[in-house]
Swiss-Prot record:
It is found in: Cell inner membrane. It comes from Shewanella sp. (strain ANA-3). HAMAP family: YidC_type1. This is Membrane protein insertase YidC. It is a multi-pass membrane protein.
Amino acid sequence: MESQRNILLIGLLFVSFLLWQQWQADKAPKPVATESSVVANATTNHSADVPEADTSVPAALTATQNLITVKTDQLDVQINPVGGDIVFAALVSHKLEQGKDQPFVLLEQTKDFTYIAQSGLIGRDGIDSSAKGRAAFAANKTEFTLADGQDTLEVPLTYVADNGVTYTKVFVFHRGKFNVDIDYKINNTSAAPLQVQMYGQIKQTIKPSESSMMMPTYRGAAFSTQDVRYEKYKFEDMSKSNLNQPTLGGWAAMLQHYFVSAWIPPATDSNTIFSSVSAGGLANIGFRGAVYDIAPGATQEISSQFYVGPKDQKALSALSDTLNLVVDYGFLWWLAVPIHWLLMFYQSFVGNWGVAIILITLTVRGLLFPLTKAQYTSMAKMRNLQPKLQDLKERFGDDRQKMGQAMMELYKKEKVNPMGGCLPILLQMPIFIALYWVLLESFELRHAPFMLWIHDLSVQDPYYILPLLMGASMFVMQKMQPIAPTMDPMQVKMMQWMPMIFTVFFLWFPSGLVLYWLVGNIVAIIQQKIIYAGLEKKGLK
């Protein structure tokens, strides 16, 4: 009985640590300002760093004149004609705050912060280099809009080199999507062969948290190769060593809670995933593509894709079979993936994420009911054996060997497994933790309303009603649990304090997580009543 309570207590403490850790993370000062304007003159903030050169020495640039604006049903983008870099990206369908029209800004370039997506052509005849600067593209207009009934929008930029070679860089936007195709079309009208190589990189300012006492949410890089399906690459690791991994396909990304930006080169090309840190404190991660030889008079097309948007697993999987791993469920991903699928399935029917959370909680609790019943049955049998176990302690005293043998004989005679109540707890805990991470990582819950006063399941209950109800439900569950006379008084006190501790943690937690825990507790109370009623009929208490 005591060992079962110890495991339960350890499990609760472990979950409470996870909750405290995430509360700290969510309350940490954000390292990035979300409201800002794009810098029009970027001679000092916009370096010409390219991967084949020493990026610690940025080249001088011609001042940016007119940014090219692109508006679709999902994206509001600004492109710098110098180099053709995406220097601003707002997600039209994802608002900064619920109930307001201002879109969430993911990419931006301000006086104090840079988060942009660069791409260009390097190599022997590349038009982008740290030594010579970036190509200054021309566009026939500076404003592009995806019209009603139009599924794709092309934004062509043109650059004519000194040798007469024409380079066309085309950005292709798609209705309903957050991915952008970047296509280079090179028409070699010169008399000499050309050798070029496409690259794409994401640059972000390394800005530490303002408070060292807080644990920031993960904001950093990640990549995938043919050997490593998914790996995070922290800013501090990037500062220590540069990444340089050849691969077939692959991708490179920058992550933050709910959102991601990523370069996805062709899966059939030989690429190199690289990283670097610039002198100005910019972390760079990206890819270098295959080398192309273009004969005189020939035309060559080179393409890649860039994604800037939410961590939508379906959309990410369509671009790469490993890009959806940026939705990081941790070591229990194999449990979390089917749970997320079931959550999406329920929501597609009921149309309310709060109701979907309730349904999936009921489903999980229902599936685990046999284990729960076995757990309480075993605990009841152990309680009934306490008088006999106490007699054995008095009979054998300090002779632990004889006492252990006598206890095993007693367990065998009474058909009781002393660990019978522990196994169900150990099996249930991973499922509950996996469900916790699914609710924490699912971007679909951002700004998702439930009912009544809960207008956003991704933020705390404004009136703290759900956390208080959750604490009350834990208190009821605790009172329903019989306490063995032999239980250590310190353990009893810790268990008594647990509802209050959890209530304090949950005060600032997302409403969706609190709803899940509250419903789970209510179902557990009902299940306990049913189980205890059946046990009493069998003479077990």
